[in-house]
Every structure is written in structure tokens, then in C-alpha cells.
């Protein structure tokens, strides 16, 4: 069985990271959460009170405090800037509400895409994000475009936030997700869109295992 590159794209809270982690584990592939990288850059910008126009300052910060990944004792992904663990802070609502703006900065995307492509050269990989199949890994053997209704995605995010102890409101989440969809699909640099050769998968009404099995079946055809 050969190792392949699997690119999973889709809007916010469509279940990309959850299924990508499981698929990577099942196949023994590396998992890379590219969204966490943009969240890390956003966290750095907010922490240092940098606006979207202060690009040079943000790039300098990312050089001084490189984004890296690790694993906890239970196998969960950890995110670092420099040697500081920011795994939990990057999931706060303030970061979530600003990440689209930071991710739309061409120079930031260029820097992080280069890092993502470097990591992908190491063998079998599952990568999820907004532009993996179109920009980061256009040569990936399997591209998946994962979608779900705004209502379902808001419910998922609501349950995640409650489980993490993050104060949240369902109706507000629906508005935020719809607004983020618009920003992600209308930005000039690497907008969210389906790659021509991607498999379209609507996960509305499906549980995680059902989605995983559908993607694994597609992957096995290509191995």
C-alpha cells in the first residue's frame, strides 16, 4: 500500500480536523492542521496589538517565534510559537473572529504555505484547511471538499465550546459562521473553493464515523 497525500478542504466547523485526525491515525500518516497555523499567526497579531496592515511586523514576529507542532502524552496535537504552548488560546473566540482577516494577508499565506509544503514532503500526510487542494497540495492524490449546513456547523461548534468551557451562544455562532463563510470564499488570496478534481461530501446528518469511512474508501482506491 503506497503512501498518498490527502487534502481536505471546507468551510469553518465542517468537521475537517476531526475526520482528518482519525484518517491520519488509521493510515499511519502525518496530520497537519493548517488552520492552527493561521490561528497561531492571528494569536501573535492580537497579543502584540498588530493590525492587518502591519504585515512586516507580523512576519518578523513569526520569524522570531516560529510556529511548530508537538504531541501530548495522549497523542493530541500541540501548537507552539517559539517554546510557548498556545494550543488552547488559539481556540478562543477572539482568535476565531479575527483569523479570516489575518489568513487573507498574501505574505502570511505565502510564508505558511511554504512551511506546509515542506512538511508534506515527508511522506503520507492528511492536511486540512481552506486551500489545500487548490494551492498547497494541488498534486494530492485525494482531494475532499467537506461541507455541512450553517445550522449543523453552529451546533457542532456550540457543543465543542461547551465541552471546553468556552462561554458561547448558538445564534451568535450561526451569524459568525455565515460571516466567516463569506469572508473565506470572497478573499482575493486563496479563497475557499472546491478543486476541480475534489470529491464533494456533504456531512449534514452524518456522524463522524460515517464521514471517515466514506473518505477512507476513496483513499484506498488511490493506494
Curated annotation (Swiss-Prot):
The record ties this protein, via PANTHER family, to: CYTIDYLATE KINASE, CYTIDYLATE KINASE/PANTOATE-BETA-ALANINE LIGASE
Q: Which GO terms describe its molecular function?
A: (d)CMP kinase activity; ATP binding; CMP kinase activity; dCMP kinase activity
Q: This protein is called what?
A: Cytidylate kinase
The main enzyme category here is transferase
The uppermost taxa in this organism's lineage are: Bacteria, Bacillati, Bacillota, Bacilli, Lactobacillales
Keywords, ordered alphabetically: ATP-binding, Cytoplasm, Kinase, Nucleotide-binding, Transferase
* Keyword Transferase included in the entry's annotation: yes
Q: What is its main location?
A: cytoplasm
- Residues the record lists as binding ATP: 10-18
The organism named in the record is: Streptococcus pneumoniae (strain ATCC BAA-255 / R6)
| E.C. numbers | 2.7.4.25
Pfam families reported in the protein's UniProt record: Cytidylate_kin (PF02224)
Q: Which gene encodes it?
A: cmk
**Where is it located?**
Cytoplasm
